[in-house]
Amino acid sequence: MVGKSQQTDVIEKKKHMAIPKSSSPKATHRIGNTSGSKGSYSAKAYESIRVSSELQQTWTKRKHGQEMTSKSLQTDTIVEEKKEVKLVEETVVPEEKSADVREAAIELPESVQDVEIPPNIPSVQLKMDRSQQTSRTGYWTMMNIPPVEKVDKEQQTYFSESEIVVISRPDSSSTKSKEDALKHKSSGKIFASEHPEFQPATNSNEEIGQKNISRTSFTQETKKGPPVLLEDELREEVTVPVVQEGSAVKKVASAEIEPPSTEKFPAKIQPPLVEEATAKAEPRPAEETHVQVQPSTEETPDAEAATAVAENSVKVQPPPAEEAPLVEFPAEIQPPSAEESPSVELLAEILPPSAEESPSEEPPAEILPPPAEKSPSVELLGEIRSPSAQKAPIEVQPLPAEGALEEAPAKVEPPTVEETLADVQPLLPEEAPREEARELQLSTAMETPAEEAPTEFQSPLPKETTAEEASAEIQLLAATEPPADETPAEARSPLSEETSAEEAHAEVQSPLAEETTAEEASAEIQLLAAIEAPADETPAEAQSPLSEETSAEEAPAEVQSPSAKGVSIEEAPLELQPPSGEETTAEEASAAIQLLAATEASAEEAPAEVQPPPAEEAPAEVQPPPAEEAPAEVQPPPAEEAPAEVQPPPAEEAPAEVQPPPAEEAPAEVQPPPAEEAPAEVQSLPAEETPIEETLAAVHSPPADDVPAEEASVDKHSPPADLLLTEEFPIGEASAEVSPPPSEQTPEDEALVENVSTEFQSPQVAGIPAVKLGSVVLEGEAKFEEVSKINSVLKDLSNTNDGQAPTLEIESVFHIELKQRPPEL
């Protein structure tokens, strides 16, 4: 204060003068002239009021003096001295000052008002911040806070704030306040973080800007860092606030996503919120559980999934998925970005095994193992995925399916696990959060490694070329493998456990493979687009190992055809070979494809997104806005990636084939050819289970698929957009998309197809998904026909592999939709 008072002696006086005026208004405010006093009082009025105000102030000050003693004393002495001086000069200067300041302040306050208006923060908090901001302001605030925090603040801002800002207090006070605010922010106490911005606004627009910046940075950092607290807080608090800030965090997610709208939002709030919510809601558990647990969470879900796996998983998981997904999804949606990141991250995480895709190519080897894991993963994924997948997948798928598809898929896949995480986290920072989420999530998720790599990797990768490739691959792999990866070994066992293990595995593999296949198609596409070759290859390798293992030979041939057919026979074969699993893959491919189809439906959408690069189309369709936006972006990229091209084919192929099959449930049938063998079984068993897994896988896949292509693109291209988009549209898209997957459920399939067609009837699917899950398989048939019809439509979109029914996928997907939607909303 001394330095300040000295440096701003005159200024202080001015401030005081202004303050007295502020006081007047404040006094007035106290009096009851809250709004009016602020802008209405003229300098003279202020003077007169000021006199009384000062008296009041002094009185109040004294009153608050004890509380404000340190602050007030500092300010009091200085202020009083200055005030005394000012009292004399006050009339003259303050008037001018106040007029000028007022004008300036008016400008500031206007913005500030808006910002400040939020004074949801307790006056006390404001007080603290304010007092911290400026002793004078602080104590004034204290005095005034109770009366009209907002107005006083604004007025204060007018004078004290504006002047202070002008003065240099911004440096000291503002900085101080900022720091305090940040602290508060960190504490989440006041939302100072949030409001600090407001408060800062109060402090000054400059400060607000700084704070906002700080906040944003801080929040982002926080997001990335502890800020989770802040974020959480913000998220939590913000959830509401954030919602406000974000949108409502999208739900929370939405709002949060919107938070994206908020500046922080995206970065922090949204993800944070959602993420947090999601993370909290699900991610944290899911995240931790999910991610870490991925097996764990998923594990639980896994167990559940395993237990309920197919149905239960679907159902159970879905609920959880839905449940979490809802939250999560929101997160996911939100995750979009972060999601994406996380997604990626997740992917990465998941992928990490994949090598995070970066290694994707290498990882392929890695992945390969993961592929081995892949199955497990898949199973886990299947389960996890189911759970997650369902949960995430759903989210993911949908999300991924569309815009999310791209991203979500990435997200989804990993997100499946991570999705929540990714979702959540991603959501969180969206981008920064993304990373943070990524890190956080990943870290949290356990995927830390993955995350790290993923985050770094994946995000980067996925986002970057890797985004495509990694995405493609990762997703592909990740989707395919990472999940597989992570869980793989386990999963595989579990999976194996399940018969589906192999099938599932195969399936998973299929998913993986399929995913890879589909994905690969995607990947291929992606590959085309991204490079995928590695992914492909890897998939091929990974898949081969895995898939091959299952029906590397058989499916591959068949699937290969389809797959190959779908995207790149060449590649597909690679993949497909792995897709061997393709039989499963075929199935899965169906599933995956289906998923793809579903996803594709989404994919279609996404593919549409991707295909059209129909990013627009699908995205437009699905997430048109977001999807479009992200997808468009993403998609275009994907399109670029080839996803558009390839994916379409794959999408088409997958969707077409898958979808039709999906439509059919026939996946078993259709897939039968490919899936036939494993699929039939798998499908049957897995169908439920596998479906889940497959779906998951598929979902995963598609996500991977779509996502890879898209996400890769998205990741890469739209990462940010994606993030937001993903979040946004992922949510929406995911919703839409999710549904498709849900639709995919078979009933959903049809819905899927329908959804796909509809694009998301997904919503309906959303509803359906869970329910249909069980039905899915069954309904799949009935729906299958419908779906077939739809598939026909989709077929148009994805004529290639119509045969393969993505019945499975549906399950995974639907969860998301529900979740996503809110987020979307």
From Swiss-Prot:
Protein keywords: Calcium, Cell projection, Cilium, Flagellum, Phosphoprotein
- Where is the PTM Phosphoserine found along the chain? S160
Q: Where is the composition biased (Pro residues)?
A: 610-676
- PTM comment text: Phosphorylated by PKA upon spermatozoa capacitation conditions.
Q: Name one GO cellular component term.
A: sperm principal piece
Biological processes annotated in GO: negative regulation of protein sumoylation
Which gene is transcribed and translated to give this protein? FSCB
Quote the protein name from its UniProt record.
Fibrous sheath CABYR-binding protein
Q: Where in the cell is it found?
A: Cell projection, Cilium, Flagellum
Q: Where does the record place Basic and acidic residues bias?
A: 277-290
User: What is the species of this protein?
Assistant: Homo sapiens
Low complexity: compositionally biased ranges:
348-357, 398-407
- Highest taxon in the source lineage: Eukaryota
